[in-house]
Amino acid sequence: MKSLEPILDVFQPGLKRGAARLPFAPHKRYFYVEHPTEGWRVYLRACTFLHEAGQPFQASRFLVVKKFGANASQKTWEPPKGQMEAKDTSPKKSVLKLLHENVQREVEEESKVQSFQNLRHTGMVFQGREPDYPENHFFQYHIFQAYVTPEEIENALLEFEWLNEHPKAFARLRKDKREKDDLSWFSPRSTRLMGRWSPSIVAMYIHKYE
């Protein structure tokens, strides 16, 4: 469920850092920050809205990716997003820097877009709680924005086309790189949003900028 709590400040100094295995993916360790006295814990996630460089800005025109093997006409699309894992963190880097690096990795893995411009944190945060979270545990999606050239979009589409034509090669990719199998511009009718959180995140983003 979406949290009714105030948005917690994960950038404040003095927070503890750690990682935990969660029931839905016990083989991974997910990064969190925790307040040393108040006791709240936040698992960090990011969602990135990729717009076309050189075109007039339209909040509702952004790239989405499709869940691997799923029916494109169903609720199987979302902007590139993901959770920060322990392996992607460093105690010497700020939380904001770690989020930026996580976005760069997730965007490349999910959308095959390898180069984008003007990546920035929008200041928007979607905070919630998973049903199996202990009391005072939360997640936050930090909302990023970036711009992609038409050439880079075409390269990503060609890579997806090649991978879908060569399923054995696709299957050999690391699991994180084969979670999605198509790329498109968002359309409420033809690229319907998947999952519990993506529809709310997209609605929040469009509402802010339109």
Descriptions of predicted regions:
Residues 57-113:
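Conserved Nudix-box catalytic region and its N-terminal flanking loop in Nudix hydrolases
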Residues 50-52, 66, 147-150:
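Residue-level signal for short segments within beta-strands and strand-turn junctions
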Residues 43-47, 138-143:
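Short hydrophobic/aromatic beta-strand or adjacent loop that forms the aromatic wall/cage
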Residues 2-56, 70:
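Acidic, metal-coordinating catalytic segment for phosphate/diphosphate chemistry
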Residues 47, 61, 182:
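Conserved beta-strand and immediately adjacent loop positions that scaffold enzyme active sites
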Residues 30-39, 130-133, 168-173:
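Short, P/G- and charge-enriched loop/turn segments at secondary-structure junctions
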Residues 72-76, 80-82, 137, 143-145, ...:
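Nudix hydrolase/Nudix homology domain
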Residues 114-125:
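A short coil-to-beta-strand element that immediately follows conserved catalytic motifs
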